[in-house]
Every structure is written in structure tokens, then in C-alpha cells.
Swiss-Prot record:
BTB domain location: 66-133
Domain BACK: 168-270
UniProt keywords, alphabetically: Cardiomyopathy, Cell junction, Cell projection, Cytoplasm, Disease variant, Epidermolysis bullosa, Kelch repeat, Repeat, Ubl conjugation, Ubl conjugation pathway
Record's protein name: Kelch-like protein 24
SMART domains: BACK, BTB, Kelch
Pfam families, alphabetized: BACK, BTB, Kelch_1, Kelch_KLHDC2_KLHL20_DRC7
Gene: KLHL24
Disease note: Epidermolysis bullosa simplex 6, generalized intermediate, with or without cardiomyopathy: A form of epidermolysis bullosa, a genodermatosis characterized by recurrent blistering, fragility of the skin and mucosal epithelia, and erosions caused by minor mechanical trauma. EBS6 is an autosomal dominant disorder presenting at birth with extensive skin defects on the extremities, leaving behind hypopigmentation and atrophy with a whirled pattern. Cutaneous fragility and generalized blistering persist during childhood and decrease in adulthood.
Span of the signal peptide: none
GO molecular function: ubiquitin-like ligase-substrate adaptor activity
Length: 600
């Protein structure tokens, strides 16, 4: 059309005029002749915008059409208001509203570097900028000020790619200052994974106390052994010993001193002059010594292994009865609450028995007695994954309970087929002997038994076939005597107890209630309800929480549910299912070495 129009104009310029009919043919088209291609959408693509930007940048260099001068640190940058406003909402607000800068030719900007402004303008006028380790920080801050999110994100991405043990803590602090949550998380995870290397660098020694604690308290800290954490903390303290000495006790509460190798503990920790001159640390040292003697009997946040060491706390379920209670199960299986994995261990010997007692001694597991009147005692060696027969009970029994107190195993009460037993026996694993100690004040079967604050507690139980007891009987090994304490709020048998943080928790007995007992203050309180009534359930403390596994419901059938109760929040949740419904089983927590090291 343009060519035709051009030809027509040329003809007129030559003095040749077309007739009206010819003009109609030139400018009018017969609709019947249209084929659907009467228009053409043309686009030069992104190159058009790039060419325009390039021309604007040339204009800027030659000060052509510039209408504002940005002054930073005394250096002037001629610019175009339209270009700045199109790229940055900061400048759009400055130039488009009735601000003083919208009328002035010279605009001064403080708080940034001239180099940063040069890089920023290069990006604005070209869409490109070279981000380096030297300019990334001020370029990030400048793009944040001018609200250029694309450039800001590019700087954050660049920092993420530069993570190294020598700089990750500094980048993390930078990310925290600028609310870069993704970068902050990546920095923290990187530092957790490479803690051994990170702790050797200057940035680590410059952490503040809270930042250091945030790392050393983490279960996800990746280390080969706990000694690395202790040494890192001591390096940090000795860096500014006069200022940091008062923080030593607080820091060591987050180091898992009980998990240090006994030789290292004696030869390195106990002889450290700073620790020796800090009486407030003595209790932590005492806890570690006790753990080396008593093992898992003494549980605290510091006895829980970090998963990266290859060890984890697992719940071991021993035997039990299947759904309708008519078949005894031979299985010994461990459950890892963190991964949700179940693994089979060596099967329980002579599993034809039922209603035996189970407890953990150090990192091994004992099973005693069983129906009918068994005197057998087996110990599971967790390192060798085998069951070994040890010295038999003096008196056969079932429906009894076992607990460990100060390194000794106590078998309490039970039933011999005719009478409830008041008999209590104590096992010394070093001499492999059982000895009788003071009997219960009230003979019971199926009570809850646990140790706490240096004493043994026997709660509830059945004094005969038809009644339940609400008595709480407390045994003191120093005096070899029993005392009655505050009664449990509801008389029950077939209940289970665990101790955590110097408190005793009781569940089961075909009630929904979970009760908590404070042995120091001698009082009970109701803390939570389960989702259904059950008895003869398993109960164990793992990773600082209480797990209730299986049990028998009101209809007599076993259940496969697993509940998790967190005393810190008083929240109870259903977390998983067992491999099969089970009741009358044993549940204990031990440390188990995993085939693979769990890392982030």
C-alpha cells in the first residue's frame, strides 16, 4: 500500500492525474479478495528495547537530553528522569510527586558509595552489571535503597554461591540484617554441615554468645564426635577470656559432656584450668561422670546424641501379645521417631512367655520372668545384637515391673499364680547376682514402676483380682526402706510410668488421662488426655518427648497407634503406626548406631 501510495504521489508530482476510478482502485479493496492476511503484526523483539537503552546510555555519556544530575560523594552523574523513574520506584516517587527533587537539577543522595551509583546506573541503562566479591555488598544495599528487587535478588544469589567455611557466618549475619530468609537458612545449614571447618576461622571467634549457642545446641550439627564442639567452645571463650569467662557455664550446658569419651573427659575437660576455677560448672561435670557409670538411666538433653555422629535415640519394642492377646510375639524391633523407620533386631529367646518385665540398663536391655512363674533373665547386648542369659531371679513371677536405679536393676512385685508379691529383688550386673531387698508395703501386680530423683517409685497396681491401688510406694536405696507418698488421683492397674526432667508421667489403666507427679513437692497433676483408653501400653522417653506405643483397648484388642506427648508444650499428637497391633510389650530407649550418618 505504501509503495502504491508512493507511486501515486510520484505520478502527481509529474503532473499526471489519475481518474476517480483509478483512485478508488488504489485506496479501496474488494472485500471478496481478502484472504485473511490483510494485516501483519511486526515486532523487533527485545533487541528494540536494548537498542533504545543503548542509545539512552550514549545520550547519558554525552549529556544529551539529560535533565537531572545525581550527586553521590561529590561525584556527579547526569541522568534522565524518565529512565530512572521507569526502572526504580524510589526515583519515580522522587520525581513524580511534588518533592523538591522533582524541580531541582542537582539531586544529592547520601548513604551510598559513588562506585555503587556507577554500577547501579550501568544496570539501569544497560540491564547488565558485573557482580563481584568486592562490590556485591554495596551493590545489594544500593539496589535495596532504590528498590530494584531483580538486582537485589541477583546479589543474594551470588552470595549464596560464594559460601565457604571462612565466610558463611559473615554472610549469614548480613542476610539476617537485611531479612534475607532464604539466604540466612542456606548459610546456617552450610555452617551446620561444615561446623568443624567453620569453627577454625576468624568469623567463628567473632560470633556473639547467642549466635554460638544457636549452633552448638542444634541436634543437626554435623560433627564426627562431641569433642569437636567442646574444643570449639573453649577456643571461643579463650579468645577473649576475661569477657567470656562468665559465659562458660551457659555455653557448656549446650555441650553434650556426658557423650565425651571418658578418657578425653578425664584428661582434657576436668583438668582445664578455666573449668576448674568455675564452680558453677561442677554440676555439669558431675552429670557427665554419672552418665559414664549409669548410662541411659540418667537422661537429659545432654545425653541425646547428635545424629551426625551416627548414633540416635531409638525406642526398642520387645515382644508382647498380638491383637486378641492369644499369641506371644517374638519380635524385637527399634523405632526411630525422627526418620519414622522400624528395624528388626535379634528375636527374643523363649518368646512363648508373656507378661514379663523389660528395662534398659546402660545401653542394653533386660527381660525377666514371665508367665508362668519364670525365673529367667535375658540381657540384650545392643553392640553385638544378641541375647545372653544371665543369673535367674530368686523367685519366679509375672505381671511384675523392672526399673534401674543408680546402676542397679530392681524387680518389683508381680504375681506367682496364687498371690500378689511384695518381693523386691536387686541385680548387680558386675557380680551377676540377684539379692532380696526390703519388700513393698503393699503387694501388687501390674503397677507402674520408675526411678526418679534417686528413688524407686511403685505406683498403683492390683493388690488382688478385683481391686486397684492408688498408693505410691517410694524406695530409698540408702536406707533400704519404703515410704508411702501422695496417692495417684485414680486407682489403677496395668499402667506405665516414665521419668523426665525429675518428674514422673503415668498413662494407661484404661483411662485417657496422663498424670504427672512431682516427687520433690509430692503432688500430682493431670496434664493431658490421650485419644482413647488403653492399658498395658508401652511408654518411653525419646529425644526429650514421651512416646506411648500400642496397648489394649476396652474391647480387649491391641492397637498399633503411637502417640507423642511433649511436656514442654503439653501437646499430644498421633505420629505413626507400629508394624502390628501389640500389648503387654516392653518399651525402652537406647542409643543405636546407624548404618549411615544422618546429615542435612
Amino acid at each position: 500500500m505504501v509503495l502504491i501510495l508512493g507511486r501515486r504521489l510520484n505520478r502527481e508530482d509529474l503532473g499526471v492525474r489519475d481518474s476517480p476510478a483509478t483512485k478508488r482502485k488504489v485506496f479501496e479493496m474488494d472485500p471478496k479478495s481478502l484472504t485473511g492476511h490483510e494485516f501483519f503484526d511486526f515486532s523487533s523483539g527485545s533487541s528494540h528495547a536494548e537498542n533504545i537503552l543503548q542509545i539512552f546510555n550514549e545520550f547519558r555519556d554525552s549529556r544529551l537530553f539529560t535533565d537531572v544530575i545525581i550527586c553521590v560523594e561529590g561525584k556527579e552523574f547526569p541522568c534522565h528522569r524518565a529512565v530512572l523513574s521507569a526502572c526504580s520506584s524510589y526515583f519515580r516517587a522522587m520525581f513524580c510527586n511534588d518533592h523538591r527533587e522533582s524541580r531541582e537539577m542537582l539531586v544529592e543522595i547520601n548513604g551510598i558509595l559513588a562506585e555503587a551509583m556507577e554500577c547501579f546506573l550501568q544496570y539501569v541503562y544497560t540491564g547488565k552489571v558485573k557482580i563481584t566479591t568486592e562490590n556485591v555488598q554495596y551493590l545489594f544495599e544500593t539496589s535495596s535503597l532504590f528498590q530494584i528487587s531483580v538486582l537485589r535478588d541477583a546479589c543474594a544469589k551470588f552470595l549464596e554461591e560464594q559460601l565457604d567455611p571462612c565466610n558463611c557466618l559473615g554472610i549469614q549475619r548480613f542476610a539476617d540484617t537485611h531479612s534475607l530468609k532464604t539466604l540466612f537458612t542456606k548459610c546456617k545449614n552450610f555452617a551446620l554441615q561444615t561446623f568443624e571447618d567453620v569453627s577454625q576461622h576468624e568469623e567463628f571467634l567473632e560470633l556473639d554468645k547467642d549466635e554460638l549457642i544457636d549452633y552448638i545446641c542444634s541436634d543437626e550439627l554435623v560433627i564426627g564426635k562431641e569433642e569437636m564442639v567442646f574444643e570449639a567452645v573453649m577456643r571461643w571463650v579463650y579468645r577473649a577470656v576475661d569477657l567470656r569467662r562468665p559465659l562458660l557455664h551457659e555455653l557448656l550446658t549446650h555441650v553434650r559432656l556426658p557423650l565425651l569419651h571418658p578418657n578425653y573427659f578425664v584428661q582434657t575437660v576436668e583438668v582445664d584450668q578455666l573449668i576448674q576455677n568455675s564452680p558453677e560448672c561442677y554440676q555439669l561435670l558431675h552429670e557427665a561422670r554419672r552418665y559414664h557409670i549409669l548410662g541411659n538411666e540418667m537422661m537429659s538433653p545432654r545425653t541425646r546424641p547428635r545424629r551426625s555422629t551416627g548414633y540416635s535415640e531409638v525406642i526398642v519394642v520387645v515382644g508382647g501379645c498380638e491383637r486378641v492377646g492369644g499369641f506371644n510375639l517374638p519380635y524385637t524391633e527399634c523405632y526411630d521417631p525422627v526418620t519414622g523407620e522400624w528395624k528388626s533386631l535379634a528375636k527374643l529367646p523363649e518368646f512363648t512367655k508373656s507378661e514379663y518385665a523389660v528395662c534398659a540398663l546402660r545401653n542394653d536391655i533386660l527381660v525377666s520372668g514371665g508367665r508362668i512363674n519364670s525365673r529367667d533373665v535375658w540381657i540384650y547386648n545392643s553392640q553385638l545384637n544378641i541375647w545372653i542369659r544371665v543369673a535367674s531371679l530368686n523367685k519366679g513371677r509375672w505381671r511384675h515391673k523392672m526399673a534401674v536405679l543408680l546402676g542397679k536393676v530392681y524387680v518389683v512385685g508381680g504375681y506367682d499364680g496364687q498371690n500378689r508379691l511384695s518381693s523386691v529383688e536387686c541385680y548387680d550386673s558386675f557380680s551377676n547376682r540377684w539379692t532380696e531387698v526390703a519388700p513393698l508395703k503393699e503387694a501388687v501386680s501390674s503397677p507402674a514402676v520408675t526411678s526418679c530423683v534417686g528413688k524407686l517409685f511403685v505406683i498403683g497396681g492390683g493388690p488382688d483380682d478385683n481391686t486397684c491401688s492408688d498408693k505410691v510406694q517410694s524406695y530409698d536405696p540408702e536406707t533400704n526402706s519404703w515410704l508411702l507418698r501422695a496417692a495417684i488421683p485414680i486407682a489403677k492397674r496395668c499402667i506405665t510410668a516414665v521419668s523426665l526432667n525429675n518428674l514422673i508421667y503415668v498413662a494407661g489403666g484404661l483411662t485417657k488421662a496422663i498424670y504427672c507427679y512431682d516427687p520433690v513437692e509430692d503432688y500430682w497433676m493431670h496434664v493431658q488426655n490421650t485419644f482413647s483408653r488403653q492399658e498395658n501400653c508401652g511408654m518411653s522417653v525419646c529425644n526429650g518427648k514421651i512416646y506411648i506405643l500400642g496397648g489394649r483397648r476396652e474391647n480387649g484388642e491391641a492397637t498399633d497407634t503411637i502417640l507423642c506427648y511433649d511436656p514442654a508444650t503439653s501437646i499430644i499428637t498421633g505420629v505413626a503406626a507400629m508394624p502390628r497391633p501389640v500389648s503387654y510389650h516392653g518399651c525402652v530407649t537406647i542409643h543405636r548406631y546407624n548404618e549411615k550418618c544422618f546429615k542435612l
